[in-house]
């Protein structure tokens, strides 16, 4: 059974696929969003034990989400090539939602790290810039600016997890799971596109092959016509050049080739006719030579 014969129409798999796109995966994404909110709350409040537990629970949700996406992917692989455009339209919204949720979750920790790095750099550059501001405007003071900067950092940046806390290790595990989930979502988005590109490529090759076969057939037909037309002429030319009875035999020989190329009953009948004419001509030739017995003499003897 070929690969195409194993495919089925989308309408047969649509209920199962929509169960994933409308219910199962959105439920997992909503659960993941709640974990993200709790993680941000516990990390901001430095409740490391609760943060560690939330990391573990979020990791379980991510694993469940990955499992459900793989199951949906198996269904997508069974869809017939004619329905790939509709399939892509069906799974794109949930694919984009999963990609966005994963990116936001990873960005939460990334922004915290980047903000801490920025804070260190700002502290190195803060004193000269504040001195210039005080000189020009006479309003902004160094102490007030430092307090404002620290206040903004505390509001927007999450505190770094101490490395001696279990939450630090559990976050690394969760981060790896989220990255794997991101790759899985990307692969799912490329699945339908790659299948469609493969089908388009095969169609292009088939069309090119059909064109080549058509052109080749036309060329063969032309060549056959030219050859069949040329052979009788060649026979006539050979017969005319050689002359006499031998030249006539040479012409018949070339004509016999043409009859063989014609094929079928016509070729067979023409060949028999040429054979009879050749036999009669041989008898005439042998009868004109006194030293050679004729075919009829041989039969009598």
Swiss-Prot record:
GO biological process: autophagosome maturation; autophagosome membrane docking; autophagosome-lysosome fusion; endoplasmic reticulum to Golgi vesicle-mediated transport; endoplasmic reticulum-Golgi intermediate compartment organization; Golgi organization; intracellular protein transport; protein localization to phagophore assembly site
One function term, GO molecular function aspect: protein phosphatase binding
Listed transmembrane segments: 228-248, 254-274
Annotated localization: Endoplasmic reticulum membrane; Smooth endoplasmic reticulum membrane; Endoplasmic reticulum-Golgi intermediate compartment membrane; Cytoplasmic vesicle, Autophagosome membrane
Phosphotyrosine PTM positions: 156
Keywords of this entry: Acetylation, Autophagy, Coiled coil, Cytoplasm, Cytoplasmic vesicle, Endoplasmic reticulum, ER-Golgi transport, Lysosome, Membrane, Mitochondrion, Phosphoprotein, Transmembrane, Transmembrane helix, Transport
N-acetylserine modifications at: 2
Topological domains, Lumenal: 249-253
Gene3D superfamilies: 1.20.5.110
Membrane-related topology note: Multi-pass membrane protein
Phosphoserine: modified positions: 288
Zinc-finger among keywords: no
Presence of the UniProt keyword Transport in the record: yes
Family: Belongs to the syntaxin family.
Complex and partners: Forms a SNARE complex composed of VAMP8, SNAP29 and STX17 involved in fusion of autophagosome with lysosome. May interact with VTI1B. Probably interacts with BET1, SCFD1 and SEC22B. Interacts with PTPN2 and ABL1; involved in STX17 phosphorylation. Interacts with COPB1. Interacts with TMED9 and TMED10; the interaction is direct. Interacts with VAMP7. Interacts with RUBCNL/PACER; promoting targeting of RUBCNL/PACER to autophagosome. Interacts with VAMP8, SNAP29, VPS39 and VPS41; these interactions are increased in the absence of TMEM39A.
Protein name: Syntaxin-17
């Amino acid at each position: 059974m070929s690969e195409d014969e194993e495919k089925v129409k989308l309408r047969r798999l649509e209920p199962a696929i929509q169960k994933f796109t409308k219910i199962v995966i959105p439920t997992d994404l909503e659960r993941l969003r709640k974990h993200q909110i709790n993680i941000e709350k516990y990390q901001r409040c430095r409740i490391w034990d609760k943060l560690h537990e939330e990391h573990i629970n979020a990791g379980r949700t991510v694993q469940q989400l990955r499992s459900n996406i793989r199951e949906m992917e198996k269904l997508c692989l069974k869809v017939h090539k004619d329905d790939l455009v509709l399939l892509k339209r069906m799974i794109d919204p949930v694919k984009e939602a999963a990609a966005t949720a994963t990116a936001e979750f990873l960005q939460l920790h990334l922004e915290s790290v980047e903000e801490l790095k920025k804070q260190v750099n700002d502290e190195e550059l803060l004193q000269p810039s504040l001195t210039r501001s005080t000189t020009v405007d006479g309003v902004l003071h160094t102490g007030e600016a430092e307090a404002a900067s620290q206040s903004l950092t505390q509001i927007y940046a999450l505190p770094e997890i101490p490395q001696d806390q279990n939450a630090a290790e559990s976050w690394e595990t969760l981060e790896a799971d989220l990255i794997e989930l991101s790759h899985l979502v990307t692969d799912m988005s490329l699945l339908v596109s790659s299948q469609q590109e493969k089908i388009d490529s095969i169609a292009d090759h088939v069309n090119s092959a059909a064109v080549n076969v058509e052109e080749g057939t036309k060329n063969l037909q032309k060549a056959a016509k030219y050859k069949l037309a040329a052979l009788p002429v060649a026979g006539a030319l050979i017969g005319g050049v050689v002359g006499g009875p031998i030249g006539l035999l040479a012409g018949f020989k070339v004509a016999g080739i043409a009859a063989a190329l014609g094929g079928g009953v016509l070729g067979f009948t023409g060949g028999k006719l040429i054979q009879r004419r050749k036999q009669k001509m041989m008898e005439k030739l042998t009868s004109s030579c006194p030293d050679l017995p004729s075919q009829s003499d041989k039969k009598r003897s």
